[in-house]
A protein has these predicted regions:
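Short, charged recognition helix plus adjacent turn
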Residues: 60-72
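Short alpha-helical DNA-recognition segment
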Residues: 14-31
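Hydrophobic micro-packing sites on short alpha-helices
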Residues: 45-49, 59-60
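Short, basic-rich loop-to-helix N-cap that marks the start of a DNA-contacting helix
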Residues: 37-47
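Alpha-helical residues within the helix-turn-helix
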Residues: 10, 21, 50
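A short, Lys/Arg-rich alpha-helix, primarily the initiator
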Residues: 1-11
Length: 72
């Protein structure tokens, strides 16, 4: 799942450290989210959107591939 976290954070002039503090996570978690190495839980995605005063849909970009289930 793609996201706009880094883009939005920079537009708002927020450092990774300050954003991490808003969310209650480490700066390393923010870095992992921004580079796509980590997908947040729905709860964390909600907190991210809330810290930006945006909706989840404005922050996260869902592709059709994100909705496909792996076959057993």
């Amino acid at each position: 799942m793609k996201n706009r976290i880094e883009e939005i954070r920079k537009q708002k002039g927020i450092t990774q450290e300050n954003f991490a503090a808003c969310l209650g996570v480490s700066r390393q978690t923010i870095s992992s989210l921004e580079t796509g190495r980590y997908n947040p839980s729905i709860f964390l995605a909600y907190k991210i959107a809330k810290c930006f005063d945006m909706t989840i849909e404005e922050v996260f970009i869902f592709d059709e591939e994100d909705l496909k289930w792996e076959s057993d």
